């Protein structure tokens, strides 16, 4: 909408209700400065393919990582960050994590899954995707850790058959 005010997100913790807190976590400033410089070059028609490929390689890591905490329950919402980006941080365990990037092979690593130690993992993905999302290796890793696994669309089995699946619904 024209005239809508845009403001930059900044890291911090905000009480949303007496029992619900939101933590906003971002990567270090240099990644955002580089992103801004590339976008400025695009707007001024000075960007080259090399810069656009560079941006494509890191833009998902500019996602806001949001953690919602209500009493003993923590929900980790990492946007589209690649696992190798956010696993560099000390992250406390959570109750539920929504995997980034539709469960792509780069969305989680064994180290990150160990650190998060979630009881439940959610993957937002459509079964009409033609890429490897969710990745079979990710599904296997999550199942081997004993996490409850929910997807937002059915995943075809090895024979291509799509059956009913557990779904998840959030009420806040």
What is each residue range found by the language model?
Residues 1-76, 147-172:
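Flexible, acidic/histidine-containing loops and adjacent segments that form or flank the divalent-metal
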Residues 25-26, 106, 115-119, 123-161, ...:
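C-terminal functional module detector
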Residues 37-134:
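Active-site-proximal loop/helix segments of hydrolase catalytic cores
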């Amino acid at each position: 909408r024209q005239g809508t005010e845009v403001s930059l997100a900044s890291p911090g913790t905000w009480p949303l209700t007496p029992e619900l807190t939101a933590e906003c976590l971002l990567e270090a400033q240099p990644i955002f400065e580089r992103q801004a410089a590339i976008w400025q070059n695009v707007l001024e028609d000075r960007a080259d393919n090399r810069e656009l490929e560079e941006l494509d390689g890191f833009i998902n890591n500019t996602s806001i990582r949001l953690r919602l905490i209500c009493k003993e329950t923590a929900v980790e919402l990492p946007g589209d960050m690649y696992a190798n980006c956010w696993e560099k941080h000390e992250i406390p365990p959570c109750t539920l994590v929504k995997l980034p990037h539709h469960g792509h092979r780069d969305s989680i690593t064994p180290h990150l899954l160990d650190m998060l130690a979630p009881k439940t993992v959610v993957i937002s993905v459509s079964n009409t995707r033609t890429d490897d999302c969710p990745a079979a290796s990710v599904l296997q890793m999550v199942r081997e850790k004993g996490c409850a696994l929910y997807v937002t669309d059915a995943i075809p089995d090895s024979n291509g058959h799509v059956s009913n699946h557990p779904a998840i619904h959030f009420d806040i």
